[in-house]
Amino acid sequence: MNFNKKTIEDIEVSGKKVLVRCDFNVPLKDGVITDENRLVGALPTIKYLVEKGAKVILCSHLGKDASKSLAPVATRLSEMLGKEVVFARDEEVVGENAKKAVSEMKDGDIVLLENTRCRKEETKNIPEFSKELASLADVFVNDAFGTAHRAHCSTVGVTDYLDTAVCGYLIQKELKFLGNAVESPVRPFVAILGGAKVSDKIAVINNLLDKVNTIIIGGGMAYTFLKAQGYEIGTSLVEEDRLEYAKEMVAKAAEKGVKFLLPVDHRVAAEFKDVEATITEDQNIPVGNMGLDIGPKTETLYADAIKDAKTVIWNGPMGVFEFENYNKGTIAVAKAMADADATTIIGGGDSAAAVNILGFGDKMTHISTGGGASLEFLEGKVLPGIAALND
C-alpha cells in the first residue's frame, strides 16, 4: 500500500467547500460525551481548514445505525473551537436542511451533517448517497483512520465523484508512525500482542514475523501457544483448533531468527473473578486454575525486551485488565514502554484505553485512533479509505 498520500497542505482550500470525514463515533451517556479523544484528534485539521478560509462540512457516523444523533458533538465542537458549528439536523443527511446550511456558508464557516448511518446506503457504499454527499463539496478530506478499513459511502464512495481527495493531519500521522514501523522500523523492533484470541491475531503474527526482531505474547491467547508447546494450562482459555497453528508459528519464528516470548509464570485463580491471585512457579498452570494475567518473572522478561528496543508496537492487554488483581502485567508493559528510549506505538482499542487510564498516554510516541483499522494495517492489508486518496 502506498503511504505517500496527498494531504490538506498539498492543495488549495481557500474559498472551497471541503467535505471532511471525521471519526466522531464517541461514547455517549445521557446525551453527554464521556470520552472526547476523537474530537480532540479532529481539531488540528478543522482549525487548519478554517484558518485557510475553507467552508468546512464535517461528516461522521455515530454508533452502528441511525439511532444516535451527532447534535451533542456539534455543541461540544463549538465549545472546543470557540466558534459555532452549525448542526444540519436532517434524517436524510443530505436533505433540505443540510443543503440550506451549506448554501449559506461563508469562508471559515463550519457545518456538521447528521450521522451518516441514518442512511442505509452508507455501509453498503451505494453510489446514490455517495453522489449526494459529494454534491455538497469541491474537495474531500478523509481524517477518520478508525473507519479507513471500511469501504463506505463517506470514506470511499465520495472519491468517485470528487477528483481532489486527500488526508487530514490525523490520517497523515497514522500513516507516518504505523507505516514507518511496518515498512522501515529502527531496530530492534518488538511487537507485543495480547488479547483473548489467537484467531484475532493470526494475520498480524503472520505479517509481523517477516518484519520484527521479537514477538511478545500475553493475554488469553498465550495459553493456546503454551499448550501447543506441551505445558499444562489448567482451565485457562484455549482454542483447540488453533494449537497446530500456534506450534507452526513458534517454529517459523525460530527459523527466521525472531525471538518469540511466551509467559514464564502466571497470576491464576480457580474462577473468572477479581479475587486475590496465586502466582505460579513456572509456565505450568495447576489443575483447576485459570491464567488471568502474566506473572512477575514474565513482567521482568518482557520489560527487558522492551528496554532494548528502538521500535515497539503494542496491541492487546496482557491479562484481564478490568480486574484490579489481574492488571499488573498490562501496567508493567505500559510502564516499560513509557520508560523506553524507542518509538512507541499503541495500536488502538483496549491497549489505548489501558495506557490512557494509567496516565501513560503522553509518554507514548503515537496512540492509534483505530482499533480495527490499525489491526488490518498491521496485517498488511490495503485500507480502502486510504487507497482511495490521491497519491
Curated annotation (Swiss-Prot):
Domain of life: Bacteria
Enzyme Commission numbers on file: 2.7.2.3
GO biological process, one term: glycolytic process
GO cellular component: cytosol
List of residues binding ATP: K201, G291, E322, G348, G349, D350, S351
GO MF, one example: phosphoglycerate kinase activity
InterPro entries given in the database record: Phosphoglycerate_kinase, Phosphoglycerate_kinase_CS, Phosphoglycerate_kinase_N, Phosphoglycerate_kinase_sf
Keywords per UniProt: ATP-binding, Cytoplasm, Glycolysis, Kinase, Nucleotide-binding, Transferase
Protein's UniProt keywords contain Nucleotide-binding: yes
Residues that coordinate or bind substrate: D23, F24, N25, R38, H61, L62, G63, K64, R117, R150
Compartment list: Cytoplasm
Enzymatic class: transferase
Keyword set includes ATP-binding: yes
Catalytic activity: (2R)-3-phosphoglycerate + ATP = (2R)-3-phospho-glyceroyl phosphate + ADP
Pathway(s): Carbohydrate degradation; glycolysis; pyruvate from D-glyceraldehyde 3-phosphate: step 2/5
PANTHER family in the record: PHOSPHOGLYCERATE KINASE (PTHR11406), PHOSPHOGLYCERATE KINASE 1, CHLOROPLASTIC-RELATED (PTHR11406:SF23)
Family: Belongs to the phosphoglycerate kinase family.
Subunit structure: Monomer.
Protein name: Phosphoglycerate kinase
Organism of provenance: Clostridium beijerinckii (strain ATCC 51743 / NCIMB 8052)
Gene: pgk
